[in-house]
Curated annotation (Swiss-Prot):
4-imidazolone-5-propanoate binds at R79, Y142, H175, Q242, T319. This is Imidazolonepropionase. It comes from Methylobacterium sp. (strain 4-46). It is found in: Cytoplasm. Zn(2+) binds at H70, H72, H239, D314.
Length: 400
């Protein structure tokens, strides 16, 4: 059988659906043609391949390319000065009254050109790519006007044109109130009738997100956004139950959301609802760490009910200025007490599920895109165990 490229003498963590554990294969082989996997499994069971190029992996481990399924890569400015103020004892409320917080990022994002947004986001994206990331989700949400949200989503699309990476875009117009609009209901009406339909028509968004929280939008307001997304034919995601239990997990499940993210305050009913709906719980330990949260997501409840769990950086300027998915692996284990298997599945198979792309990425299985990360480690657990260490040997996207 003819193939473009063959990786031999490799150890595989396939993460395949239904495989025990990480789907480990000690003497493995991967064959690819036209960017897709033809075979991934034991060398002894492989068909006879005639390869244009053969790569000897010398016993290295291969995993699926890593996936960061929750980021806010596109934004103007930073919030380093606020970080210093917080260290000096200033509260979030004091910072906000002084013109800081998310409003400061909105102003900086609106003031930046689309080219400038692309340039700054590429620096953050490059840090992720250097750790084996082959797919990333990018949200808008710092423009909060049709023009600025359009620019943010266009910038996100351009990231995938500028780098060899799969980019999924998410419209997050219901992120916060813009500084010029004091009325939440009126703003949500604008999101639903003007912003979302326009950006959906232009094909700029692959999904729609919202922030359901006391400091953001109510469950009823969030439901209006999700109804508008449904009318536009777009799947939904939700920032849910991060700071309080507003029933966000159950709301996400009711709308069949791809994912519900954060979830520190989710309850058992919410965990069960997520499992029934097939909605992935995306856990974000970077934000938990950075803003010194003390309440962990209810991981034991997710396990009990069979809720799928993913991990992501939540890279954003205010609460998680983090561009290391490898560090997130360690944080997931140490802060949230996930197992090695849960962590690695959380940045591959379950992250793909959270983006609605499991049919094409996230595991090493025939028919999927040949997105690989090759690692200089003795065992996959090292990827979770080590901190501040990047053992990536090679990153392959679509067989190249």
């Amino acid at each position: 059988m003819l193939c473009d490229r063959l990786w031999r003498n490799a150890r595989l963590a396939t993460l395949a659906e239904g495989a025990p554990g990480l789907g480990l294969v000690e003497d493995g082989l991967i064959a690819a043609r036209d960017g897709r996997i033809l075979y991934a499994g034991p060398a002894r069971a492989a068909p006879a391949f005639a390869a244009r190029e053969t790569v000897d992996c010398e016993g290295r481990w291969i995993t699926p390319g890593l996936i960061d399924c929750h980021t806010h890569l596109v934004h103007g400015g930073d919030r380093a000065a606020e970080f210093e103020a917080r260290l000096a004892g200033a509260s979030y409320e004091e910072i906000a009254r002084a013109g800081g917080g998310i409003v400061s990022t909105v102003r900086a994002t609106r003031a930046a050109s689309e080219d400038a947004l692309v340039g700054s986001a590429l620096r953050r994206l490059d840090a992720l790519i250097a750790e084996g990331v082959t797919a990333v989700e990018v949200k808008s949400g710092y423009g909060l006007s049709v023009a600025s949200e359009r620019a943010s989503l266009r910038a996100a699309r351009r990231l995938g044109e500028s780098r060899d990476v799969t980019v999924t875009t998410t419209f997050l117009g219901a992120h916060a109130l813009p500084p010029e609009e004091p009325d939440k209901d009126r703003y949500i009406a604008h999101v639903c009738t003007e912003m979302l339909p326009a950006l959906a028509r232009e094909g700029l968004a692959d999904a729609v997100d919202a922030f359901c929280e006391g400091i953001a939008f109510s469950p009823a307001q969030t439901a209006r956004v999700f109804e508008a997304a449904r009318a536009a034919g777009l799947p939904v995601k939700l920032h849910a139950d991060q700071l309080s239990d507003l029933g966000g997990a159950a709301l996400a499940a009711r709308f069949g959301a791809l994912s519900a993210d954060h979830l520190e305050y989710a309850d058992e009913a919410g965990a069960a609802a997520l499992a029934r709906a097939g909605t992935v719980a995306v856990l974000l330990p970077g934000a938990f760490y950075f803003i010194r949260e003390t309440r962990r997501p209810p991981v034991d409840l997710f396990r009990r009910h069979g809720t799928r769990m993913a991990l992501a950086t939540d890279c954003n300027p205010g609460t998680s200025p983090l561009t290391s998915l490898l560090l997130v692996l360690n944080m997931g284990a140490t802060l949230f007490r996930l197992t090695v298997e849960e962590c690695l599945a959380g940045v591959t198979r379950e992250a793909a599920r959270a983006l609605g792309r499991l049919h094409e990425i996230g595991t090493l299985e025939a028919g999927k895109w040949c997105d690989l990360a090759v690692w200089d480690v003795e065992r996959p657990a090292e990827l979770v165990y080590r901190m501040g260490f990047n053992p990536l040997h090679a990153r392959i996207r679509r067989g190249r």
